[in-house]
């Protein structure tokens, strides 16, 4: 079965074509600068990189060009569009309705549109991608895989905010969580690597990219996660503040004469690592390099970043009444030995965690980095959201399902 995976953003579209009989990536790429001058496709096939420069005024045109590339004699991997059996789409917000991946029909599209008020930056471009593919590949089934779905069945005690209950009833203000596809892939893979029964294991997954979140996965279900109503809650991120006292918002509005929208932009785009480092960088690689050169501010930023992560891991060990494994993933999680080591050694030794320095000296590679006698296993598990989306797509098509429950 050939599956095309599409992740449609506001000005870019990531795509991957997979042969699901052997889970092999046939080719992949990124259409960037959609609707902006200088639009192009960066395409990869068999380790080779190709640049296709073409005007892409909108998502329809961008995906049309992507499909042409997939069929191209030199760049592509198929001879005819009929070879594409299904398309899997990343959709950011599924609200409370979707707790699993779904076969997309008019009703599902309507629901995604309804949830757009919860993810105004993400759901509309996700929908543009879905609608464009439906036009370009009529008759090919489309599957929606939601970032929120894995967390949708968190218990009420984990997802409700302690604000008047009517706001939950009126506006569905609650904790939703994000990065669900990544947390699901990494937790499942962790259980496989360790030979644990996924449905009986207690796993903490630590997704550290420019956006970052942690999940507590107990018996194969997400029981808590650090992001909330929006991806602003939780950890210190590249440009997001993470947890803070909400009264800071009204305080800044008053003292700086700012609108709610302006404060929101500050907390989302100008805070986190970027804000703490006095606008030096939002990239943890830059912060780490300077911290290792004994720059006091960058050392402090790294300390704050790690401290917040360690607190959440400790909290989730309590939430699950124990922990079998902790897995680091995404850009920073996969590629920063120092962050992993400092979190585990400085804060988590009380859990009986011991890190093997040599094994931890790994970047972007699947590996157990704890010692054999470590009571809790610590791993690096590179995430693979596209594969997870493709697997869900295959399962729904093969089993003739409308919705796949996790």
Swiss-Prot record:
Single GO MF descriptor: magnesium ion binding
Entry EC number(s): 2.7.2.1
GO cellular component: cytoplasm
Compartment annotation: Cytoplasm
UniProt keyword Kinase present: yes
CC cofactor: Mg(2+); Mn(2+)
Superkingdom of origin: Bacteria
Coiled coil segments of this chain: none
Keywords: ATP-binding, Cytoplasm, Kinase, Magnesium, Metal-binding, Nucleotide-binding, Transferase
Residues at which substrate binds: 90
Chain positions of site Transition state stabilizer: 179, 240
UniProt-annotated catalytic positions: 147 (proton donor/acceptor)
GO biological process, one term: acetate metabolic process
Binding site for ATP: 14, 207-211, 283-285, 331-335
PROSITE patterns: ACETATE_KINASE_1, ACETATE_KINASE_2
InterPro entries cross-referenced by the UniProt entry: Ac/propionate_kinase, Aliphatic_acid_kin_short-chain, Aliphatic_acid_kinase_CS, ATPase_NBD
Cofactor note: Mg(2+). Can also accept Mn(2+).
CDD domains referenced in this protein's UniProt entry, alphabetically: ASKHA_NBD_AcK_PK
Keyword Metal-binding recorded: yes
Principal location listed in the UniProt entry: cytoplasm
Catalytically driven reaction(s): acetate + ATP = acetyl phosphate + ADP
Role description: Catalyzes the formation of acetyl phosphate from acetate and ATP. Can also catalyze the reverse reaction.
Subunit structure of this chain's protein: Homodimer.
Name the record gives this protein: Acetate kinase
Organism: Thermosipho melanesiensis (strain DSM 12029 / CIP 104789 / BI429)
């Amino acid at each position: 079965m050939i599956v095309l995976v599409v992740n449609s953003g506001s000005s870019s579209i990531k795509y991957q074509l997979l042969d699901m009989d052997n889970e092999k990536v046939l080719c992949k790429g990124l259409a960037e600068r959609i609707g902006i001058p200088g639009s192009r496709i960066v395409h990869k096939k068999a380790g080779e990189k190709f640049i296709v420069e073409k005007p892409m005024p909108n998502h329809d045109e961008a995906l049309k060009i992507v499909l042409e590339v997939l069929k191209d004699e030199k760049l592509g991997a198929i001879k005819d569009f009929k070879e594409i059996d299904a398309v899997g789409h990343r959709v950011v917000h599924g609200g409370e309705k979707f707790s699993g991946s779904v076969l997309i029909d008019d009703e599902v599209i309507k629901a995604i549109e309804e949830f757009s008020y919860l993810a105004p930056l993400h759901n509309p471009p996700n929908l543009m991608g879905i609608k464009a593919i439906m036009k370009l590949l009529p008759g090919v089934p489309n599957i929606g895989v939601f970032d929120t779905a894995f967390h949708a069945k968190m218990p009420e005690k984990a997802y409700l905010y302690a604000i008047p209950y009517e706001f939950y009833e009126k506006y569905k203000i609650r904790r939703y969580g994000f990065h669900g596809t990544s947390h699901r892939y990494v937790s499942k893979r962790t259980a496989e690597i360790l030979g644990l029964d996924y449905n009986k294991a207690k796993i903490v997954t630590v997704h550290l990219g420019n956006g970052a979140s942690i999940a507590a996965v107990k018996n194969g279900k997400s029981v808590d996660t650090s992001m909330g109503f929006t991806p602003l809650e939780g950890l210190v991120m590249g440009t997001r503040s993470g947890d803070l006292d909400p009264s800071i918002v009204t305080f800044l509005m008053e003292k700086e004469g700012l609108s709610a929208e302006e404060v929101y932009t500050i907390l989302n785009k100008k805070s986190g690592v970027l804000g703490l480092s006095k606008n030096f960088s939002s990239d943890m690689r830059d912060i780490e390099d300077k911290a290792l050169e004994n720059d006091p501010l960058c050392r402090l930023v790294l300390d704050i970043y790690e401290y917040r992560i360690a607190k959440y891991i400790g909290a989730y060990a309590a939430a699950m009444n124990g922990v079998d494994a902790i897995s680091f993933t995404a850009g920073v999680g996969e590629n920063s030995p120092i962050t992993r080591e400092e979190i585990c050694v400085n804060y988590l030794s009380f859990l009986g965690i011991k890190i093997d320095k040599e094994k931890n000296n790994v970047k972007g590679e699947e590996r157990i980095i704890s010692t054999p006698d470590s009571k809790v296993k610590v791993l690096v598990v590179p995430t693979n959201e596209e594969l997870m989306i493709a697997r869900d797509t295959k399962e729904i098509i093969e089993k003739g399902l409308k919705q796949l429950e996790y």
